[in-house]
């Protein structure tokens, strides 16, 4: 069980980081530049994609937590995992609801200025990327210390 937990600690944060970078920093901005993608279409796609991304992220965070219970990686790694999870929860529970309301209004035909909450979400995504990189290093260090 401990060996599976350690492999989980190596694989899941790298997968999580790849998903966030690919979706938040590649797919999201590029889709609005695609020919024929209107703001309404882009918002509709974005809502679905980010709902799915955040759902998978929550599962990954829980799976990583479970692996850390099975094979504790040390206080620093646990702290970084907690911080990444807090950032995710803030995004889902605090920032996304007003963004959803705003996109509903835009889809209903209102012409609204850019939202600061969108910038907050992007800032949290950048923080999450930095924390995931730190988590990867901490977990790799913890797993390496268990090797013969």
Give the residues covered by each predicted segment:
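Interfacial loop at the N-terminal end of multi-pass membrane proteins
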Residues: 2-64, 106-111, 146-148
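Mid-chain, well-packed structural core segment of small domains
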Residues: 70-105
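Juxtamembrane boundary at the C-terminal end of a transmembrane helix
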Residues: 133-148
